Regions:
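Amphipathic coiled-coil/heptad-repeat helices and related helical stalk/stem segments
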Residues: 1, 43-44, 88
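A positional/architectural concept
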Residues: 23-52
Length: 169
């Protein structure tokens, strides 16, 4: 990790992540009964746990109105799950007040156009390897990991490394 990334990661007190395309592979899976299913990576759940153990909270934010996302957020013990969010920048302002953090103390992970504006407002921005090119042009870090394959865990490990925190439970 280069010194610029370490400097940005040291300040992080809160991680906000998009869901579809970051915590999932972005695919839409349907059961034979028409029920929507999503595949999550357990490594990301451990990343949330490691951050929380070190007083760094996680927030899920998605434009989808999904019960599955709410359930996953609860299982991962995230600080908050925001669904059906059409304007992520406005929500960021509220989150800063609720969690008493500055924008430069927030990391954001996103993969698509609806993440573009918020990525420009936070202290550390990340897009997965399969994020859109527009985000790759502006993100502080482009992961080599695709969404749904543990990109959140990679970011969690980077933040903890920058803060000289050992990642054992």
């Amino acid at each position: 990790m280069n010194q610029k990334i370490i400097k940005l990661c040291k300040k992080i007190k809160l991680v906000i992540t998009d869901v579809d395309g970051v915590l999932t592979d972005g695919g839409m899976y349907y059961s034979d009964k028409g029920e929507i299913m999503k595949k999550f990576n357990t490594k990301d759940g451990m990343g949330v746990e490691l951050l929380l153990k070190n007083n760094i909270k996680t927030v899920l934010m998605t434009k989808e109105n999904s019960i599955i996302v709410k359930k996953r957020g609860k299982k991962m013990n995230v600080a908050a799950t925001y669904v059906n969010i059409k304007n992520k920048e406005q929500e960021l302002e509220k989150i800063c007040k609720i969690f008493d953090v500055k924008k430069n103390e927030i990391a954001y992970i996103g993969d698509d156009l609806n993440d573009y504006n918020i990525i420009t407002l936070v202290g550390f921005s990340v897009t997965p390897a399969n994020g859109i090119n527009q985000l790759k042009e502006i993100a502080n870090f482009i992961s080599k990991i695709n969404g749904g394959d543990g990109v959140f865990r990679e970011v969690a490990d980077m933040i903890l490394f920058a803060k000289n925190i050992k990642t054992n439970l």
